[in-house]
UniProtKB/Swiss-Prot annotation:
The keyword NADP does not apply. It catalyses: an anthocyanidin 3-O-beta-D-glucoside + malonyl-CoA = an anthocyanidin 3-O-(6-O-malonyl-beta-D-glucoside) + CoA. Belongs to the plant acyltransferase family. The lineage of its organism: Eukaryota, Viridiplantae, Streptophyta, Embryophyta, Tracheophyta. This is Malonyl-coenzyme A:anthocyanin 3-O-glucoside-6''-O-malonyltransferase. The gene is 3MAT. It comes from Dahlia pinnata (Pinnate dahlia). Gene3D superfamilies: Chloramphenicol acetyltransferase-like domain (3.30.559.10). Catalyzes the transfer of the malonyl group from malonyl-CoA to pelargonidin 3-O-glucoside to produce pelargonidin 3-O-6''-O-malonylglucoside. Can also transfer the malonyl group from malonyl-CoA to cyanidin 3-O-glucoside, delphinidin 3-O-glucoside and quercetin 3-O-glucoside.
């Protein structure tokens, strides 16, 4: 990392909670968490306007971020712990957990870059490889006698001279979902802005670590289906490709209303439609049509799949609080024929199937966990898979460390996860931001199809 072009490392730090505030603690993984054990790390980037000198950055910002992260970690101890996994498939007595021991620390790197802040924090197509120096590696897995340990969280703060700051976060997905990560960031930002944790504790919601979701059968099934023998692999940072670009597209309320109208005009009896389902359906159809535009020859009957995460906290019986720590979502997998998706009514059919899939999952008579043992069966179907990363319900643009709200939020890990990022827009939480990563020629085709379709939706 010290030899990355356009990047100068200013400081490598290890941040621990205040002494004796946590001690030895562990957090068992649930069946929700285990599903993510073999997935690659999650990379997020936040850009902030910061038109100040390097001396102000080093003398004020760096100490404040160090201190506030230390204070925050005592309330979110799993972020500073290590993932413990026992790869031996014949040993069923020891389960994966996140364990903290006194002295554990988070890697916090401070750097300076010559990259263009205004370019990276814009919406237009930008080279993917320019984002990779701004997100930190997670750290290496270490094989002990009969288990493997792995850091679960790392941070990099990068200074753009007299223009901005970026905060890059990397976490293992088994650590948390977006809800937990959002709570952690809100807490850290509050402590950084105020200098103490009392405002966060008074006005926020400290995490709930109780493992009240107990379903031994689901747990064992999920654990047995996870090939832990392959876990001992150093996680790799996002690879580079000079031809890939990332861009952000905005779906305004007027666009979303037009898309809903198109769906309901053709399917007036459709029981469930929402801003989320029409957005996902529209993105999915635009991506496939952009591939056709690029000359892709795919059979009409070949299958396409789209995966969305359905939040489960409020849908369990009894429901879990929003500040429950960890992962708590279920995959909703929708399948459609390529010929239908790329056809004239592809968007409408995609939105219909996504809505029906979500509705069927959340309205089961036996609760959302009914047939949970079949959640992942769809992944076995031979089909091209795409999915959504993120949710517009959490406004990450509201994260303010004392320099104002974020100028731009990017999910860098969509570059290798075949996903599209979806978040609330920085100008209005009722508008959506969509982040995509494609080869440059496909991005041009996607942009034209996307924008032309929106013009048609508004005009109809």
């Amino acid at each position: 990392m010290d030899n990355i072009p356009n990047l100068t490392i200013l400081e490598h730090s290890r941040i621990s909670p205040p002494p004796s505030t946590i001690g030895h603690r562990s957090l068992p993984l649930t069946f929700f968490d285990i599903a993510w054990l073999l997935f690659p790390p999650v990379h997020h980037l936040y850009f902030y306007h910061f038109p100040y000198s390097k001396s102000h950055f080093t003398e004020t910002v760096i100490p404040n971020l160090k201190h506030s992260l230390s204070i925050t970690l005592q309330h979110y101890f799993p972020f500073v712990g290590k993932l413990i996994v026992y790869p031996n498939p014949h040993d069923s007595t020891r389960k994966p957990e996140i364990r903290h021991v006194e002295g554990d620390s988070v890697a916090l790197t401070f750097a300076e870059t010559t990259l263009d802040f205004n370019d990276l924090s814009a919406n237009h197509p930008r080279k993917c490889e320019n984002f990779y120096p701004l997100v930190p590696p997670l750290g290496n897995a270490v094989k002990e006698s009969d288990y493997v340990t792995l850091p679960v969280f790392s941070v990099q703060v990068t200074y753009f001279p007299n223009s901005g700051i970026s905060i890059g976060l990397t976490n293992h997905h088994s650590l948390s979902d977006a809800n937990t990560r959002f709570g952690f960031l809100k807490a850290w930002a509050s402590v950084c802005e105020t200098g103490e944790d009392q405002p966060f504790l008074k006005n926020g919601s400290p995490p709930v670590f109780d493992r009240v979701v107990v379903n031994p059968q689901l747990y064992e099934n999920r654990l047995n289906q996870t090939r832990l023998g392959t876990f001992y692999q150093a996680p790799s940072l996002v690879g580079s490709s000079s031809d890939r670009v990332r861009a952000t597209f905005v779906l305004a309320r007027t666009h979303i209303s037009g898309l809903k109208k198109q769906v309901l005009t053709q399917l007036p009896m459709l029981e469930y439609t929402s801003s989320f389902t029409v957005t996902c359906g529209y993105i999915w159809s635009c991506i496939v049509k952009s591939l056709v535009n690029m000359g892709e020859k795919k059979g009409e009957d070949e299958l396409e799949q789209f995966i969305v995460s359905v939040g489960c906290r409020s849908r369990l019986d009894p429901p879990l609080p929003e500040n429950y720590f960890g992962n708590c979502s279920a995959p909703c997998i929708v399948t459609i024929k390529n010929g239908v998706l790329k056809g004239e009514n592809g968007f409408v059919m995609a939105a219909k199937l996504i809505g029906e899939g979500i509705s069927k999952m959340v309205n089961k008579k036996g609760g959302i966990l009914e047939y949970a043992d079949r959640w992942y069966d769809g992944f076995k179907i031979p089909a091209r898979k795409m999915g959504i990363s993120g949710t517009p319900k959490l406004n990450f643009y509201d994260i303010d460390f004392g320099w104002g709200k974020a100028m731009k939020y990017e999910v860098v890990s969509i570059d290798y996860s075949a996903s599209v990022s979806l978040s609330a827009c920085k100008e209005s939480a009722q508008d959506f931001e969509i982040g995509v990563c494609f080869p440059s020629m496909q991005m041009e085709a996607f942009g034209k199809i996307f924008n032309d379709g929106l013009e048609s939706a508004i005009a109809s």
